[in-house]
Amino acid sequence: MLGKMTGQEALDSGIVEALNFGPYLVVNGEACEVGGFTEAGLNPRTAIGQRADGAFLILTIDGRQPSSMGATYEDLIEIMMNYGAVNAANLDGGSSTYMVQNSETENNPQIITQCASLYGPRKMATSILVGRADQINTQYE
């Protein structure tokens, strides 16, 4: 669900868990105008989207590196729409971005994407976990 609401409106809607992010990239299948946002040039990016069939799309792009220049908001819109997103939004894309995949055969998480930082990895208070509840181990360090 995309939208701006007060805490009380969210509770009245039955929302139990929520994240705040932006700018919106795609809403109801239409590309959004993202002009006026800071950091609009090439930067590390993270985005989340959802297709009409309910599937989630999560994208990470490193940047400010010789091997990866980063992406613009317009790049994110194009990628998300190419993969069928009907709704998508930008998340924080700096060194707080990690994409981790758990091994199919053992409980051994592997880092797929880690956006570089001069200061090393950041501790994060919030993460997005995708999978069946009985298969998600939240005890990673």
Where are these regions (language model features)?
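Gly/Ser/Thr/Pro-rich low-complexity, intrinsically disordered segments
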Residues: 1-141
